Amino acid sequence: MPTIQTKHTLAPQTELYYETYGEGRPVVLIHGWPLSGRMWEGQIDALRHAGYQVISYDRRGFGQSGKTATGYTYDVFASDLKDLIEALKLNDVTVVGFSMGGGEVSRYAGLFGMQYLRSAALISSVAPYLLKTEGNPDGGMAEADVEGMVQQVAANRPQFLAGFTKKFLNWDENGSKLGDEFLDFTASLYFQASPVATQECVRAFAMTDFRADLAKLTVPLLVVHGDADQIVPLEASGQRVPQYQPNAELHVMKGAPHGLNATHAEEFNKLLLDFVAR
């Protein structure tokens, strides 16, 4: 099983599971909550056939990576990403972060600048800052909402995630083309995650401020968001990114939900491939 050992000392060291396909310029795919690198199946195929080396990995606490008791913060996640890039000796990298994975991309810029990077993409991302505060009135979640979500996950994770998945995919509109089997596949990824990581990452993605990080994300930046996203609404996230990084190129996908890489794969893959080719 291919893994790398984290080296930084911000959290307990652990193994990160990764998969790599194809040859060419590297593209690193960072998954969302509470999934794993397997969420990118449709994109891995498109990218490897287009002549890129594609690396997907599981965040600590998720998929087949190590399940640490602590360390579920974005400083740790971004440092894990840097350790992966260095262990695999990657350079000229395009990093693509989905949902909470957009936080890794943003915080990486804040901590390490543009080291090793060629370009970046934020897909249905939690950036710039989801928490609604006096200084961030356009945030999408009040603190009580965040803690309520954590409590629901802790009380009955399977029940909560069953409902979450249908909102993630806007199932009433998209279920017929994906099929019930896709729900089973998604659930199988959820339950590879540790309960602790599943809970703690809600606080991490909802309560971490990425606004200053985005200002340092100066490589070409693609932002893709669906205007029917029920999980991370466009108005609270993707639409706001250009305020903090004017070089961001925002593409709003009409009628697309949070999980647009699955429901609108053909449209999304074209956007991604066109961007990566630059």
What are these regions (language model features)?
Residues 230-236:
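Conserved alpha/beta-hydrolase "acid-adjacent" motif
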Residues 217, 223-225, 229:
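Short beta-strand/loop motif that positions the catalytic acidic residue
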Residues 246-278:
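Catalytic active-site module of serine/aspartate enzymes centered on a nucleophile-bearing elbow/loop
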Residues 76-93:
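Conserved acidic catalytic loop of the alpha/beta-hydrolase fold
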Residues 10-70:
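Conserved HGGG/HGGXW glycine-rich cap/lid loop of the alpha/beta-hydrolase fold
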Residues 31-33, 93, 97-102:
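Conserved alpha/beta-hydrolase "nucleophile elbow" surrounding the catalytic nucleophile
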Residues 106-111, 115-155:
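Flexible "cap/lid" loop of the alpha/beta hydrolase fold
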Residues 128-140, 151-215:
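Conserved alpha/beta-hydrolase catalytic His-Asp/Glu region
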